[in-house]
Curated annotation (Swiss-Prot):
MF terms in GO: asparaginase activity
Pfam families reported for this sequence: Asparaginase, Asparaginase_C
Identification of the protein by name: Probable L-asparaginase
CDD domains reported for this sequence: L-asparaginase_II
Assigned keywords, A-Z: Cytoplasm, Hydrolase
Any one annotated GO CC term: cytoplasm
Family: Belongs to the asparaginase 1 family.
């Protein structure tokens, strides 16, 4: 029977889903304690829906995720996706930076096959740990034919998300992941997958970014978080460290103080690419109080600062033309 089942490649990177603690009733634990074999051993029912080919890419807390692992993960995922024997790829990942890794993969992988990222909010030794069921659901989504050509997906807490929209919204709740601007793309319940919408922004096979043309390190892009009474000091420090681009997590509709705005304009005139995003959890950034064309700024649409940074890093490998980069933010 197993020979007739689809083959899913499981790439493990660590995180809470692979974490372990001493006391099941306490919140303290260490991420990345369990290897991929131990994860699979805890879910024997996976063998009823797929043949799992597991590999360990890294075993870290996702606060330590970096470009080097991104490239290693993406290259291995692409190799597996190009293998006709593999139906899809599932990636276990810590939740802290999951949305950034997922968006990077959504822009650089080229395949119509399902790619699903999954994590957990409670470590494997916790009371009512959520990782095992989340992983079972992620594999269920990956083996479903309707999951093809939807770009990279995130599965958490019975819910299927497009990676462009998904964001972590709570530090501890298992329902932390939300798509605040557009809603979830579908749901999964004990293996039954349902979709309600189709991604419209460019992803995977439509993307102009290719792993074969990229190299690490990517162009340096910083995020500057603004606040009342903000001065340009941190922004200037970013420029002094040779940032090629800066994403501004502005207040409200991506706004900044008058003094900060002047510093941004001067940097833009020197060739630094400035993207205005927002520290607000939802909504888009538009040219309202700030005339972005006149200042030479780019608006992030409704991409949050961390995803805007990923897109800008990749965009800068292609061009420094601000009009073209603005188009990318409207297309991806």
């Amino acid at each position: 029977m197993a020979q007739n089942l689809p083959t899913i490649a499981l790439l493990a990177t660590g995180g809470t889903i692979a974490g372990s603690g001493v006391d099941a009733s306490l919140g303290s634990y260490k991420s990345g304690e369990l290897g991929v074999k131990e994860l699979l051993k805890a879910i024997p029912s996976l063998n009823k829906i797929a043949r799992i080919q597991g590999e360990q890419v890294s075993n870290i807390g996702s606060q330590d995720m970096n470009e080097e692992i991104w490239f290693k993960l993406a290259q291995r995922a692409q190799e597996l996706l190009d293998d006709s024997r593999i139906q899809g790829v599932v990636i276990t990942h810590g939740t802290d930076t999951l949305e950034e890794s997922a968006y990077f993969l959504n822009l650089v992988l080229h395949s119509t096959k399902p790619v699903v990222l999954v994590g957990a909010m409670r470590n494997a030794s916790s009371l009512s740990a959520d990782g095992a069921l989340n992983l079972y659901y992620a594999v269920s989504v990956a083996v479903n034919e309707k999951s093809a050509n939807k770009g990279v997906l995130v599965v958490m807490d019975d819910t299927i998300f497009r990676v462009r929209e998904v964001v972590k919204t709570h530090t501890t709740h298992i329902s932390t992941f939300k798509a605040l601007n557009s809603g979830a793309i579908g749901s999964v319940y004990y293996g039954k997958t349902r979709y309600y919408m189709q991604p419209l922004r460019k992803h995977t096979t439509e993307s102009e970014f290719s792993l074969s043309q990229l190299k690490t390190p990517l162009p340096k892009v910083d995020i500057i978080y603004t606040h009342a009474g903000m001065t340009p000091d941190l922004f200037q420090a970013s420029l002094n460290s040779h940032a090629k681009g800066v994403v501004i997590a502005g207040v409200g509709n991506g706004n900044v103080s008058a003094g900060f705005l002047k510093a941004m304009q001067e940097a833009s005139q020197m060739g630094v690419v400035i993207v205005r995003s927002s520290r607000v959890g939802s909504g888009g950034v538009t040219s309202g109080e700030i005339d972005d064309k006149a200042y030479g700024f780019i608006t992030s649409d409704n991409l949050n600062p961390q995803k805007a940074r990923v897109l800008l890093q990749l965009a800068l490998t292609k061009t420094n033309d601000k009009a073209k980069i603005q188009e990318m933010f409207e297309e991806y």
